[in-house]
Amino acid sequence: MITLYNTLTRQKEVFKPIEPGKVKMYVCGPTVYNYIHIGNARPAINYDVVRRYFEYQGYNVEYVSNFTDVDDKLIKRSQELNQTVPEIAEKYIAAFHEDVGALNVRKATSNPRVMDHMDDIIQFIKDLVDQGYAYESGGDVYFRTRKFEGYGKLSHQSIDDLKVGARIDAGEHKEDALDFTLWKKAKPGEISWDSPFGEGRPGWHIECSVMAFHELGATIDIHAGGSDLQFPHHENEIAQSEAHNHAPFANYWMHNGFINIDNEKMSKSLGNFILVHDIIKEVDPDVLRFFVISVHYRSPINYNLELVESARSGLERIRNSYQLIEERAQIATNIENQQTYIDQIDAILNRFETVMNDDFNTANAITAWYDLAKLANKYVLENTTSTEVIDKFKAVYQIFSDVLGVPLKSKKADELLDEDVEKLIEERNEARKNKDFARADEIRDMLKSQNIILEDTPQGVRFKRG
């Protein structure tokens, strides 16, 4: 039974899907005007783990995460670089996939883009105007915030609280300072689309409402994103979506905490933004992922090199213990009376599931993984090893690895994968068979340069890493 903290109710709730056995999940993705920073990477990693755990528990997860490919920041960037908005977006969408792929974040079921849904967005806004929830003014379209009775329920603020400090900027034609933009009138030289309200482009909030509706329907199970999106972005999404669809927008809202840099909030003014594109040149991406999930997703994380080094050391400890188990697997035999170890491994697995069932507590899940490694180290020190116990260890290690998304073996950027090595060995065997010894020697030397040693055995050629 999975429980999660619902920002909407401010309490943990038992997860009950709309459709048995299925999870419909929408995660707010990046505005693709630059490489992502470590703060953008956190939700990608955290909600990837959530998805993986649901799948481990047998759910079919439809995981949708959008790209905002038209926005003020993109327009400004395109003007700075003298490139079109689509060109900028394409570049950084590709960079996003590369960066999060390095962090072992699995591809979403769907990555909708704003530009691909422009007709849907325009129709959605038109529907809101027709229903009286929105109005056109001076070429812009605004949402009537006060007309939606539930406004403020996610951020737990009242309309009266919000009214304090609300203002109408120069050039805006709002009925009320609390109203927010659905459609922006085109400015000279900016990318725009034709609509019943005139040339323009959508506001940020309406985009996610429409893409979520198009991809997942009127009501979704889980909507997730960073804490900074709770207000006004997610609050406005609820207002638009529920006014339009006459149904709850999302049953559960999840928000991850911030990442601070050396105990200071990331900000452009401080110049302490750290791009994932740059970090992974210096820090193993597996270590970075392990570092992020070593803290509960709702808690803030402090990023500094000392803490990253601690994560590297912890992951190395886990991997070293797994390597010992793999080595013992070569000499393991069928030994009876090993139930004590089987029971201890099962107890650790049960604890892992218990803490993951409790709002996806990856910090405590990693503690369980450390305990598994400690037990494994103790076991391999014994003179005899049981095939049953070794297989049990390996199976549970693999479960932890799959759920948390942290590989059990390090993959250096220039390191060949095992399947690649096997293919090269097959090619070398074929070359030798055809008496193409030059090619056979070339392959052997290439593998040797990667510290891969070939060994001839009665069962054929095998390899080991030096």
Curated annotation (Swiss-Prot):
Q: What GO molecular function terms would the record report?
A: ATP binding; cysteine-tRNA ligase activity; zinc ion binding
Record's catalysed reaction(s)? tRNA(Cys) + L-cysteine + ATP = L-cysteinyl-tRNA(Cys) + AMP + diphosphate
The free-text note explaining how the cofactor binds reads:
Binds 1 zinc ion per subunit.
Q: Where is this motif: 'HIGH' region?
A: 30-40
Query: Binding positions for Zn(2+)?
Result: C28, C208, H233, E237
EC number in record: 6.1.1.16
The sequence motif named 'KMSKS' region is recorded at 265-269
Ordered alphabetically, the record's keywords are: Aminoacyl-tRNA synthetase, ATP-binding, Cytoplasm, Ligase, Metal-binding, Nucleotide-binding, Protein biosynthesis, Zinc
Q: State where ATP binds.
A: K268
| Annotated S-S bridges | none
One Pfam annotation, family name? tRNA-synt_1e
InterPro entries named among the record's database cross-references: Cys-tRNA-ligase, Cys-tRNA-synt_Ia_DALR, Cys-tRNA/MSH_ligase, CysS_C, Rossmann-like_a/b/a_fold, tRNA-synt_1_cat_dom, tRNAsynth_Ia_anticodon-bd
Q: Which GO terms describe its cellular component?
A: cytosol
The record's comment on protein family reads: Belongs to the class-I aminoacyl-tRNA synthetase family.
Q: Give the quaternary structure.
A: Monomer.
Protein name (Swiss-Prot/TrEMBL): Cysteine--tRNA ligase
Give the species: Staphylococcus aureus (strain MRSA252)
Q: Which gene specifies this protein's sequence?
A: cysS
